[in-house]
Amino acid sequence: MVILENVYKVYNEGTQQAFEALRSINLHIAKGETVILSGVSGSGKSTLLSLIAALDKPSSGKIVVAGELISKLPDLHASEYRAKRIGVVFQHFNLLEDLSVEENVIVPLIHSGLSLSTIQEMAAKSMQRAAIGHKATQSVKELSGGEKQRCAIARALVHEPELILCDEPTANLDKANSLKFIEILEMLHTLGKTIIIATHDPLFEKLSFVGRVIHMEDGIIKT
């Protein structure tokens, strides 16, 4: 499902401020596998997620997702790749605060070419999965932190992505809401989704549905 071969990422390359964020990353993740990227802040796990999401490009190396080479995609094709294959749950939610929950959830489908009724059906299904359907018409700015996270999950799932990427998904949640989020992840795992979670929360490493914990330190995978 996800293959990284000899991936490097250098910021400010060719300058005195050059910083090697990732070095010699080789990683294969199977379809349907749930993987934890573990490490302290600055270890490279969020950078790695951004490359898999085609939000940034590697300095060198190859990244293949579901048979598609995504490491050198032009920006337009990268947007199409994200809209088709992946859902991303960000640490800070990245929601449109003045819109309702439903309006936020349908954002990934705006340019899909689907009918309004189909879009609404897909949004309703996704909100139900994320246990936020009862707040569909409520403004996002009125939600609690846990509710905002569930809205972000519903938005990430609305287009039925094959791959789900989560970047420090419980960093802004209390323990009760963190456990609710984990329940949703377990449900997605049973549906056969491929899930990659970047976190330093030790709670994730103990979950029965997690296939592997990959430890990162100073931009490399520790073995």
Map each language-model feature to its residues.
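Catalytic Walker B motif of ABC-type/P-loop ATPase nucleotide-binding domains
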Residues: 164-167
